[in-house]
Amino acid sequence: MSMIWNHSAAGRWGVGLGLSVLALLGAPASADAAHVKGRLEGFRLLRNPVWAEAKDPTNHGYSFREAVPTVRADFRRPFPHIPKELCVALLATAPQKAPPPVLVRVGGGRTTPVTIVVPPGTRLTFQNTDPFKHRLYGVDIKTFMPADQGQGAQREWTPATPGTYEIRDEAAPSLRMWIVAEPTVASITYPSMKGEFSVNVQQPGEYTLQAFFAGKKVGDAVPVKVDAADVDLRAAIKVMDQKTADAEEKASEEKAAKAAKAQDAK
């Protein structure tokens, strides 16, 4: 399902993260909002950088099980949980105001969401939902240094300038989150497991749809003109193709093999 959190009375921000985050993102959208509806494809080919990092033996991380030949190849390859990893952003032609504070849950070895796109100046509140402490920090971010965060505790941080910021956890090395501070983002949403999405639009105008994964743009930018009525995109937005995915997988495997060889030589 799709969720909205309000920017004052405007209700411009949409997040489709499902029932598990109803308490996180708050109020319903304005009844006057139009919606841009569409579908993503190729998302099962996306590869979270955490997986590639885990293959490096020098990190002493977890390892993947041997492939089972009786299982179909497309199920033997990891694929992302796009309802919180793949963010669909609606970009306006002018800078947007920051919305009210956004709650990010930290639990189960991950954050919810994993990638988020917000205007600079948006206050993010990180809440620990695990029964043990976390030590979040921002990579190369002097204003977000490691600090203990116990069960239920909250911690706030605001991206002041445009850019991409990575959040990690000293207590859980596989936890990685990406915050994209984009001045023109007017609304965001997260797709269903089938890739379907609906993003709300409060003001008519010219917009651009752009998907983000692991802090980076994926797929082509799609121009959209919104009037009073909903817009249904006929063509699916491809966020990854097989050729590129295979090339990235090959490069990852070669890097892991090289690291393993160097490790054995020590």
PLM features: residue spans?
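N-terminal secretory signal peptides that target proteins for export/translocation
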Residues: 1-11
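N-terminal leader/targeting segments
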Residues: 3-5, 17, 35
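Bacterial N-terminal signal peptides
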Residues: 14-26
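Extracytoplasmic copper-binding redox domains, predominantly the cupredoxin/blue-copper superfamily
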Residues: 31-266
